[in-house]
Structure formats: C-alpha cells, structure tokens
Regions:
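Conserved catalytic cores of large enzyme domains
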Residues: 1-149
C-alpha cells in the first residue's frame, strides 16, 4: 500500500479522480499523449460528441507541443498543468473537485524543487518507473471517458 503525505493536506481522492490522474501521468510519462488526454476525460461530467472531443484534443496537443523534449528548466510544468486543468474544465466538462488539487499541488511543489536542484531533468518522463511500481502494487481501474463516436 502506498500512502502519500502532503505537508498541506491529508485527503482521499475518489477513484474516478485518482484513476484518471494516474492514467494521465502514466501515459504522459511514456510520451503517449493521445492516451493521456483521453484519460483526463474520465473526469468529465459531460458527454462529448466527436467535434467537442476533437477540439479538446487539439487544444491539449497545443499545450503539450514539444513537452517531452524540454526539461523543467526550459518550461514551467506548473503553468502547463494549469493550462491542462483549464482546457479539461472548459472544453471537456471535467470536474476535478477539491480532492484533485492536493495531487496537483504536490506536483507543483515537486516542479519547484526540481527546477532549483536539477533543472535539466525531464520530470514527467522520469516518473515512469515509479508509476509502473504503483501499477504493480495498487489496483487502479481504467477511467471511463464520456464521448460519443
């Protein structure tokens, strides 16, 4: 069992929130952008038609253009995360709820720490082995995206 302790909060995230965010970061760390963006749709309360989904995906690809090529010293992971949340909320009807923000905030703290200590690191891709370890030890269900083909 993994227990995360954030200096600012002890909380529980509902399965659809933790699963969607886990899958998002897992796919992102493996440079599978399409699957990462699809995973965030597990937070959507809207049913997206194909056009809305295409618009959402296009905006996400714009946000993450060259993302995997740059280190934390070359880009602000915190700003990218805020753009991601905004796009998911505005274009896909995602509802993160207050339970998601300790997870996001912890990554922002990590981003700040890495910028100061190891600015050449590609933070998200370096998370991949640890996410594989989580997957091996935790039952993480697949998020169910809501959109119409």
């Amino acid at each position: 069992m993994f227990v995360f302790i954030d200096n600012g909060a002890i909380c529980h995230a509902p399965t659809h929130v933790s699963s969607s965010l886990f899958r998002f970061f897992e796919h992102l760390s493996n440079s599978n952008l399409n699957a990462a963006f699809e995973a965030l749709l597990g937070l959507s309360e809207d049913t997206l038609d194909e056009k809305k989904k295409e618009e959402y995906m296009a905006k996400m690809y714009d946000i993450y253009h060259d993302f995997e090529m740059r280190s934390v010293g070359e880009q602000s992971l915190t700003q990218i995360m805020m753009k991601t949340v905004r796009c998911a909320v505005e274009d896909a009807g995602a509802v993160f709820g207050e339970e998601a923000f300790p997870i996001i905030r912890a990554l922002m703290y990590l981003d700040g720490l890495v910028i100061r200590t190891h600015p050449d690191v590609k933070l998200i891709s370096s998370m991949s082995p640890y996410l594989e370890e989580f997957r091996a030890c935790l039952p993480i269900p697949e998020p169910v995206p809501r959109y119409i083909n």
